[in-house]
Amino acid sequence: MRKYLLLFLAFFGSWSMSVRAVSFSDINYWIGEGNVEAMLVIAWNDGKTPGALAWGYKGEEETTIVEMLNDVVKTDPRLFSLMRRQGGYTVDGLGFDLNGENTVALVVGGDTTYPKSNATGQFTATPNNFKKWECVDKEDHWNSPSVSEDGVWHCLARSESGNEAETEINKMPIQNRYTYIFYYDKPGSDTPDYANAVAVEPYIQDAVDYSQGIFFVNEDWYGWD
């Protein structure tokens, strides 16, 4: 098991005894550069624990909410997204490599023969297929609308004083010391608990053990050397 996952689980164990909401002082992983500090919280509503995770983000006054989300996805290899873009971004799916197995991949329309992966963690859906995507690793965090079950990702903006309001993400810039909460809403389900989000630990890339050989993938050939 990876070191970062062990640290993450240990941290979650200490949090399970607490009921206070996550705060900026809890953040362990800051992404970006700038003079505006914000927090990104994602609550999956998928029954897995911890149910919500938090990142710190530093951006500029003109940085929009969706730009913050995209930056965090591109920087943290454990986090991945599915979006449509038609005059703006629509968030259809968000996922997180919860078990630390580096199996960030999605399938479309049940095609498990050729799962899709993306180096940036950003997957693009279309109006015709956005309900047909599934996460390969069923132990990971993931939620998106499907043909059999509707659902939608909402975004809330919360000030330090605790005021919350739903917000659009494409034009609205981030505000200093605000928390932006993406949570998944599905029919017949309560709003997920995002206040007690767990601050993620920084991603630590394991060193590659070349003594075990190298696996090559080419256009028409693959194998070990």
Model-derived features: positions:
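Sec-dependent N-terminal signal peptides
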Residues: 4-15
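Sec/Tat signal peptide C-region and signal peptidase I cleavage site
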Residues: 15-21
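Ubiquitin-like/PB1-type beta-grasp interaction modules and other compact soluble beta-rich domains
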Residues: 21-224
